[in-house]
């Protein structure tokens, strides 16, 4: 019982890859990064379909929601995505990490890791889906931008981990027991 409901007056950008209809539902004034999102979807579906298993749905869709929250999440076939971390992100500085591309690849990867392959309902289960989605997105990122960009992203993630670890109140658990610790 894991679903999402979104509603709005959307423009829709579409394309197809590997027999899968890719769709991005977006506010009419927020189209600047939509081609980038479609490319990340196309690359992630292509990579994971060949490396792991065919995509299990006929459609993969991203749906914009207002920036009152700042996240993206993967539901079966549908990925709600905040306007603030994708649709209106300024990507003109090409020396920075393309977080729009990476986050889309990561959320698409959850169509395999978390929706096709599920861990048991127990402490630490999120580690499987998150680490495999992370790995998949890193492989897609490396293929698109090269090893140096992937290493730059890993440095960013290391720094994020160290910041989160410094604020941790309950201590660091073994990986098999991690839950609700976003920095890990």
Regions of interest found by a model, annotated:
Residues 28-30, 117-118, 177-184:
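Flexible glycine/proline-enriched surface loops and loop-helix/loop-strand junctions
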Residues 37-38, 122-130, 183-184:
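Active-site metal-coordination segments of metallo-dependent hydrolases
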Residues 108-124, 139-144:
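Catalytic Zn2+-binding segment of zinc metalloproteases
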Residues 130-184:
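Acidic/His/Gly-enriched intrinsically disordered linker/tail segments
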């Amino acid at each position: 019982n894991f679903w999402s409901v979104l509603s709005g007056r959307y423009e829709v950008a579409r394309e197809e890859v590997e027999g899968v209809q890719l769709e991005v539902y977006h506010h009419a004034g927020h189209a600047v990064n939509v081609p980038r999102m479609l490319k990340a979807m196309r690359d992630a579906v292509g990579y994971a379909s060949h490396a792991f298993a065919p995509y299990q749905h006929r459609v993969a869709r991203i749906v914009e929601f207002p920036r009152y929250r700042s996240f993206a999440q993967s539901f079966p076939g549908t990925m709600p995505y905040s306007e603030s971390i994708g649709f209106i992100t300024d990507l003109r500085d090409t020396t920075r990490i393309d977080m729009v591309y990476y986050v889309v690849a990561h959320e698409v990867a959850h169509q395999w890791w978390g929706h096709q392959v599920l861990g048991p309902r127990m402490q630490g289960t999120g580690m499987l889906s998150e680490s495999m989605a992370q790995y998949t997105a890193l492989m897609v990122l490396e293929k698109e931008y090269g090893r140096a960009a992937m290493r730059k992203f890993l440095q960013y993630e290391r720094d994020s981990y160290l910041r989160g670890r410094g604020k941790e109140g309950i201590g660091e658990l073994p990986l098999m027991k991690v839950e609700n610790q976003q920095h890990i």
